[in-house]
Amino acid sequence: MKKKNWIYALIVTLIIIIAIVSMIFFVQTKYGDQSEKGSQSVSNKNNKIHIAIVNEDQPTTYNGKKVELGQAFIKRLANEKNYKFETVTRNVAESGLKNGGYQVMIVIPENFSKLAMQLDAKTPSKISLQYKTAVGQKEEVAKNTEKVVSNVLNDFNKNLVEIYLTSIIDNLHNAQKNVGAIMTREHGVNSKFSNYLLNPINDFPELFTDTLVNSISANKDITKWFQTYNKSLLSANSDTFRVNTDYNVSTLIEKQNSLFDEHNTAMDKMLQDYKSQKDSVELDNYINALKQMDSQIDQQSSMQDTGKEEYKQTVKENLDKLREIIQSQESPFSKGMIEDYRKQLTESLQDELANNKDLQDALNSIKMNNAQFAENLEKQLHDDIVKEPDSDTTFIYNMSKQDFIAAGLNEDEANKYEAIVKEAKRYKNEYNLKKPLAEHINLTDYDNQVAQDTSSLINDGVKVQRTETIKSNDINQLTVATDPHFNFEGDIKINGKKYDIKDQSVQLDTSNKEYKVEVNGVAKLKKDAEKDFLKDKTMHLQLLFGQANRQDEPNDKKATSVVDVTLNHNLDGRLSKDALSQQLSALSRFDAHYKMYTDTKGREDKPFDNKRLIDMMVDQVINDMESFKDDKVAVLHQIDSMEENSDKLIDDILNNKKNTTKNKEDISKLIDQLENVKKTFAEEPQEPKIDKGKNDEFNTMSSNLDKEISRISEKSTQLLSDTQESKTIADSVSGQLNQLDNNVNKLHATGRALGVRANDLNRQMAKNDKDNELFAKEFKKVLQNSKDGDRQNQALKAFMSNPVQKKNLENVLANNGNTDVISPTLFVLLMYLLSMITAYIFYSYERAKGQMNFIKDDYSSKNNLWNNAITSGVIGATGLVEGLIVGLIAMNKFHVLAGYRAKFILMVILTMMVFVLINTYLLRQVKSIGMFLMIAALGLYFVAMNNLKAAGQGVTNKISPLSYIDNMFFNYLNAEHPIGLALVILTVLVIIGFVLNMFIKHFKKERLI
């Protein structure tokens, strides 16, 4: 067994020796002596100095122009022939400094262009051009580098001064051009105002004059018409239209004989029917029934023969008896009893209210509910005002009356909602006074969001509809021009043929001389055109009908037919629909909550008034006790009233008796009449004699009727004449009204055109004002800080004379050109190999001697855990001691500056502890596999070192753990990056390695691990 262990040890030792020799040969071959390279670069003069340029500058904008001074600086260096410059990334430059590819790295910072163009700043910030030299360079190389950087910087500063002067001159030229443009725009606006709006307004009163004249003329004709019509009606005699009703006018003369015969025949038939039906009438039954009813009435009347005095006497006796009973009743409550009862009842109620737990609980519950209600109400008001970070839509904008009017409300509504906004501000101030500063609330600033909500135009769009009929003999082409801010959906129908709504030219059928145009579609606003659309808030669609391919002859006086069908939709009202409704809803909700808040605000929590309640209850009981006497008097008054009304009651009874008597008399008369009818039916009826000579009376009636009709005809002729005259006047009135309607339409069209022109002119003037204001604002900034009061701004002067300064990125290493330094790569490699040897020593001891037990087994059940912790501590302490020794040696070799030594030694100690703990764990736990992993990490590091070329870092660097340690030491020694995060990570890895070594699992049988 021991022989086998020594074989393992020998193999591992050989592997380590081979790795060390290979590493030394590789490092010597790759890096060599940097001091020797420095001497060679001096001997090969300046053209052997390689300078890496790292351009991190970001472009900026000045006076509307893009400025990239980083590129200009690189172009300036390209003209330098004495040195070799290369533009690379920062990682490539740092790698080049590390492996000797570059001797100098010049870094153009990110804000280089922005800081260089601070011509308008009062105190410009300094611009620094950063540079760094490679570690271990000779002093002569460093001096030459400083000289190169200084010379290039001086030349570049001269160019910057020229750029500043050019910029100032350009600003003056731009100002001159803008002033000329302002004058041109003002002249154009004045000319357009005169021709486009002022002259049409001067002609506008003439339209009112024409309308007034036509209105007066039409009024005169209407007055004359009504006067004539009234005169005709008044002159007409109503008797003229009255027909003599003594004659049967409905019977026509030419049919009188035939009708007379028909009537005579009908009469004969009626007599025959009478004779045949009279026997079927049973009058005896009716007469007997009425006699029986008459006898019943006699019996009832005999029973009601009591006189009026008897009725009256009976009623009086009953009322007197009732009055005596009521007067005999006395009140059971004396005055003393009432006062004693009042006192006892008051004391009892006071005691009950004071000791009633249910009542106290109810009062406390009311107080708690009121407090909870006030708290909830304040929260609702807070939520109504404040805009939450998420998609909250129940907040209130700080809008003024003008903002509401601009959003589409009338003045009354704007005043109403402005008052609600003021209430919100008032509540906000009260709320902030009660709350700490961190909980203060504010209304959301309003930036025209409500008046510029284009969501409905983007999602729903606007309907585009138009119907037009165009007549022309020479139109053969349609040109469609759509608004570039909108996407159009739909079609254009030309005589039933469909075309899409898009920019296009369509050849029309020339056989038609009439084109029926129908436009039906939807225009949706493009999201990326929202800003441009809000400038005029109008959607345009132009349909231009014209004649294509026509070449006008010089003598051809016939103009080309062009019909422009343009649709212009001003969508100002659509921009505030949804957002305005949402805002008004939020304001209404706040107003309702605020009214409840003001109603409950002034109420104080007063104690419950028990005394008032007790007095009210006692007074109610006492009043009922004292009201007995009043109730008795009221009943006696009612009895007296009944006695007074007894006569009327008796009269009603007697009147009913009289009505019964009258009914009896009527029945007797009816019986007598039926007896007479019975006698009449018993007799035979006489046939009437018809006088045939009565026909002459019909002739007389015909003559009279003819006279009446003649009179009516004369009057109707006169009325027809008057009607014709009225028609003539009505036609004249109609013509005047048509002319008046045309004048009104013309007046309306002119007013609408003037409104459109005024809006166009207003938009142009507003645009000119905006451009002028922008120019004044921008021109005001030009060199506004060139003076500090009455004196020249010395800071700006110093900046413009020497804007860019150099800044040396110092290294942690002492830059001694006569001293050789060790590479961080070799340093990290030696540390890792030392940790591998240490780990193998611990592993070999444990295999030979067994696990280290510092505490006896019979001491405690937790001895194994304590032994493992002590073992991990010993391993970690070994790494700490080795790290301290290696750190002190490396500090002297690297010549670390005094202020950086403590951190450097701490980094070395933590790195060494991580290496020792992790490698020891791998060997103790997974043995041969652990050794393989350790050698694999070392091999990856070798491959990564071979890939450290100027081309950049490869994938191997990203997966090699030792490469990260190498970069950490390199960055620290070159003062490139802070190491705080690196120290934290190393500390965490030390803790992990310590814990892993505490939990080693030992296997009973030998396995691969």
UniProtKB/Swiss-Prot annotation:
Sequence intervals crossing the membrane: 7-27, 822-842, 869-889, 903-923, 928-948, 979-999
Keyword entries, A-Z: Cell membrane, Membrane, Transmembrane, Transmembrane helix, Virulence
Compartmental location: Cell membrane
InterPro entries recorded: T7SS_ABC-Transporter, T7SS_EsaA
Predominant place of localization: membrane
Keyword tRNA processing among UniProt keywords: no
Lipid bilayer topology: Multi-pass membrane protein
A Gene Ontology term for the protein's cellular component: plasma membrane
Secretion signal span: none
Subunit organization: Homodimer. Interacts with EssB.
Family per record: Belongs to the EsaA family.
Note: This strain lacks esxB and esxC.
Role according to the record: Component of the type VII secretion system (Ess). Provides together with EssB and other components such as EssC and EssE a secretion platform across the cytoplasmic membrane in the host.
Protein name stated in the entry: Type VII secretion system accessory factor EsaA
Source organism (scientific name): Staphylococcus aureus (strain MRSA252)
Gene: esaA
